[in-house]
Amino acid sequence: MAFNPIAPVHPLMLQQNLNPIQENNPVEGSGPQTPAGAAKVGADFGQFLQEALQKVDNLQKEADVASLGLATGQIQDLHTAVIAMEKAGLSLSLTVDVRNRALDAYHEIMRMQI
């Protein structure tokens, strides 16, 4: 078994094989370019949050009605009332967790040094 010697590496050969670094061009359409676009995205997010909180509020109201109906004897289905209360409890718990995560993220951003 014969071994071939390793050819020496010349710096000029390395430079010929390297491609020059190209300028980074921003990608067109990669995000809102104007304050109007940013305001629209903010409004959409605000609308989304408002709708989500409205759904949580509606579930809480349904649970209140179900528990009141169960207490007064108007609702005979125990499982319907329990399901409504569990939905309301879970949705409120999720809402509180999302709020806590958002506050943690805000505090983390505020701790960043510029």
UniProtKB/Swiss-Prot annotation:
Keywords: Bacterial flagellum. It is found in: Bacterial flagellum basal body. Disulfide bonds: none annotated. GO terms for cellular component: bacterial-type flagellum basal body. Its main location: other. InterPro entries: FliE. It comes from the Bacteria. GO terms for biological process: bacterial-type flagellum-dependent cell motility. The keyword Zinc does not apply. Signal peptide: none annotated. One of its GO terms (molecular function) is cytoskeletal motor activity. PANTHER family: FLAGELLAR HOOK-BASAL BODY COMPLEX PROTEIN FLIE (PTHR34653:SF1), PTHR34653. Belongs to the FliE family. NCBIfam families: fliE. HAMAP family: FliE. This is Flagellar hook-basal body complex protein FliE.
